[in-house]
Amino acid sequence: MSETALKPVVMYNTLSGNKQELKTIEPGRCGIYCCGPTVYGLTHLGNSRAAVVPDIMVRFLRHQGLEVKYVRNVTDIDDKIIKRSQEEGMSPDELARKYTEEYHRDLASLNTLEPDVEPKVSDTIPEILDLVQQLVDKGLAYAVDGDVYYRVKAFGGYGKLSKRSVDEMLEGAGARIEVDTRKETPLDFAVWKAAKPGEPAWDSPWGPGRPGWHIECSAMSATHLGDSFDIHGGGRDLIFPHHENEIAQSQGAHGEDTYARYWVHNGFINFAGEKMSKSLGNFFTTREITALFPGETVRYFLTTVHYRSGLNFDLEVLCPGCSAVLDKAAQESGLCPSCGMQSSTEVLKDQVRFPNLEEADDRLAYIYSTLAQARAFLTTAKEPGIAEPALDPVLGMLEAFIEHMRNDFNTGGALGVLSKPLSEVNALLTSGKGVSKAQRHGTIKAFVEQMAEVADILGCFGADPGPWLELRRDMKARRLKLDTSRVDSLLRERQTARQEKDWAAADRIRDELIALGVAVQDGPEGSTWSFI
């Protein structure tokens, strides 16, 4: 824990509409509930952002000395699961188990912590039934033909999270959605659904059925965190109706002063100007992207902007002839307007680039390269007898980083703090001119030590630099279709030329490698290569 950990954490609360100091219900402890996946398919990058954001919050609050209980649910009962199970020819339970495992695999590749509790809807049926019964007993829900609906007009605070008026919603409801005449108002939503043939069902006082979507989170959060807890998180798309309905259910059952104190919502990932989502079909799965880039690169990319901001995911298709970026029309026709080359769809599939992911990959490689050199320096350099304080900006790096994190978990601002220290350390690694040996050593040592704390908070920069850089290099080579066996062969030829003191041949081979986009690093144990 940092020595500055006693300063307050300020966070934006969707419920209040402004930033507030985090004051937990129980001093020193924090309960966090986040809506997890509906497990009917592989996760896309937007789903992964909704997991990485609370993961960083949990890491940071623990770093600041709080004892955090983190609960993230799995929705394993849902209309989408039932539909997909029929398409894949398996039971809903089998499909949910399959994609829960795949979800865990994807999050492991992004270095997310496991939640302290991961409840499933199917394991929470008794608690859900009890909550539905409480709502019925209080006149907040009513049964119709085996369905049970929440009576929205009976809850006076409805709309306070999403800042919507019940009367205005009712005025336009009939035009937006098909009206179910069995419901008292179009806004009433199901907390229990009557069984349909071939679907999962449980016995209830209202007949066989299954839970509605919103009641599930109300029941699971109360079961594991109590009627009141500190932070509720999720994607911005869940504010209405899901989180609004959670509040209505939970406060309706337990009282107006209960449920989550702070509501946090992450922004969308935007692809081609639209929110990335399964419903729109404009998404890349996390699995597809981590086949091209290290998982840590993806995680780093997700942290480069403030969690409430939108994050643009860019894709470019290049002409295989002249490397010009093709617009949508050129991609569809296959004709490059710059050089006139005609390419098939199959050829263009191999010309896809992800510029902002590549930028994140390059930046992460720069940080790991700096860490590798800094650690090597500390291993080989003789430690001075007299310690001297680190130079600015390394001296205050961690404190400045933490200040940004205290201000609504601002990872984008926190990452910006690292730029000057990285430049300073690289300069010191290259040359120690102008500073004492003790100050040079102390600055590099302080950088490595502070980066270890940064790594604990962000979940980035904590891997062994050498193996990570090799992994990154090999994955980039595959993306660029670079023949690494050819590179290795040229390195061996160059090594032979150097041993034979044929400097002209060694330089010629180096130039050939440069033309391939490869830089050579000569060391006492031989030569290695990296991308320029």
Tell me the role of every PLM-derived stretch.
Residues L6, S16-E21, I25-L113, E525, ...:
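N-terminal, positively charged nucleic-acid-binding surface of large information/translation enzymes
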Residues S85-P92, D116-S122, G235-R236:
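The substrate-binding groove and active-site-proximal loops of carbohydrate-active enzymes
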Residues V74-D79, T100-Y103, L113-I128, G146-F155:
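Short, glycine/charge-rich beta-strand/loop segments that flank catalytic centers
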Residues T285-I532:
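Structural preference for alpha-helix termini/caps and helix-kink/transition segments
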Residues L66, L140, V518:
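Short phosphate-binding/catalytic loops that engage adenosine nucleotides
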Residues S2-Y40, D55, R105, P126-R375:
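Alpha-helical recognition segments enriched in aromatics with Gly/Pro capping
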